[in-house]
């Protein structure tokens, strides 16, 4: 199972890619695999403010609905609107096409609380 080494991870199975002061966030391959076929993705509005741990949307699969949790605090600067029409991207391309939101980071220190790829792999038993 892919766990890209350049990303950080949350214990709730979100991945975080940092570029400058913006974090791109999605769910991991492990999470989408556990959920099964994704049929709907609900995402927030641009400019919404999030605190670490806030729910910012949900993914619905044929099995269940799972909340999405903000791994860091900040302001949403972009939302992947393609997922509204193509939720299957979450299964097909969790680390590329299926990014969910981009957040302007408001507290850099929260990045230290995220897991490395090795720590995340250990957590999921890989």
Curated annotation (Swiss-Prot):
Record key words, sorted: Lipoyl
InterPro entries tied to this protein: 2-oxoA_DH_lipoyl-BS (IPR003016), Biotin_lipoyl (IPR000089), GCV_H (IPR002930), GCV_H/Fam206 (IPR033753), GCV_H_sub (IPR017453), Single_hybrid_motif (IPR011053)
Annotated SUPFAM superfamilies: Single hybrid motif
Single GO cellular component term: cytosol
Cofactor: (R)-lipoate
Pfam families reported for this sequence: GCV_H (PF01597)
Co-factor: note: Binds 1 lipoyl cofactor covalently.
Domain of life per record: Bacteria
Protein name in UniProt: Glycine cleavage system H protein
Organism encoding this protein: Staphylococcus epidermidis (strain ATCC 35984 / DSM 28319 / BCRC 17069 / CCUG 31568 / BM 3577 / RP62A)
Annotated gene: gcvH
């Amino acid at each position: 199972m892919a766990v890209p080494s350049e990303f950080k991870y949350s214990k709730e199975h979100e991945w975080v890619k940092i570029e400058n002061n913006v974090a791109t966030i999605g769910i991991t391959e492990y999470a989408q695999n556990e959920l099964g076929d994704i049929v709907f993705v609900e995402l927030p509005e641009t400019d919404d403010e999030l605190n670490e741990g806030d729910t910012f949307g949900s993914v619905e699969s044929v099995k269940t609905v799972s909340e999405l949790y903000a791994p860091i605090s900040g302001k949403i600067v972009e939302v992947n609107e393609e997922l509204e029409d193509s939720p299957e991207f979450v299964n097909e391309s969790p680390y590329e096409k299926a990014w969910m939101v981009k957040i302007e980071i408001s507290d850099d220190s929260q990045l230290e609380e995220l897991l490395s790829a090795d720590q995340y792999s250990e957590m999921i038993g890989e």
